[in-house]
Structure formats: structure tokens, C-alpha cells
């Protein structure tokens, strides 16, 4: 499992899981798996980072 702070970051922005999944164009199930620490593709991480309004260079704020 990979370490990430996605859930905490998402909640700090007061964004629901459903809303973030929609913005990132991924399924809610995929987002749930990632928040639980399951591995994810770089492409999926990129979608999430951009949907959160971050730059790709800010990846470490969410994913480690």
C-alpha cells in the first residue's frame, strides 16, 4: 500500500468524495481505494491533483 494524504486534503477543502471523483473523471470506487492506500496509476494521480486545483509539482502534498 502506498501512503497518501488524499482524504485529509480533500476534507480540508470541504470537497465530497463524489465531487472530487466527478472533477477528476474517475469512479468513486477508485477514489475510495486510493484514499485507503491502494496503489494507483500515475495518470490517475495526475487527474486527482489537477482536480484539487494543485500543480503537478505539488504531488507530494497529497501522494508520497
Specify the residue positions occupied by each region the protein language model found.
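Residues that mark the N-terminal boundary/hinge immediately upstream of a DNA-recognition element
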Residues: 5, 16, 41-44
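Short alpha-helical DNA-recognition segment
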Residues: 14-32
Amino acid at each position: 500500500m502506498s501512503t497518501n494524504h488524499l482524504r485529509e486534503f480533500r476534507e480540508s477543502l470541504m470537497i465530497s468524495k463524489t465531487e472530487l471523483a466527478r472533477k477528476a473523471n474517475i469512479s468513486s470506487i477508485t477514489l475510495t481505494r486510493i484514499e485507503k492506500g491502494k496503489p494507483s496509476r500515475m495518470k490517475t494521480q495526475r487527474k486527482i491533483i489537477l482536480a484539487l486545483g494543485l500543480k503537478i509539482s505539488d504531488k507530494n502534498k497529497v501522494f508520497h
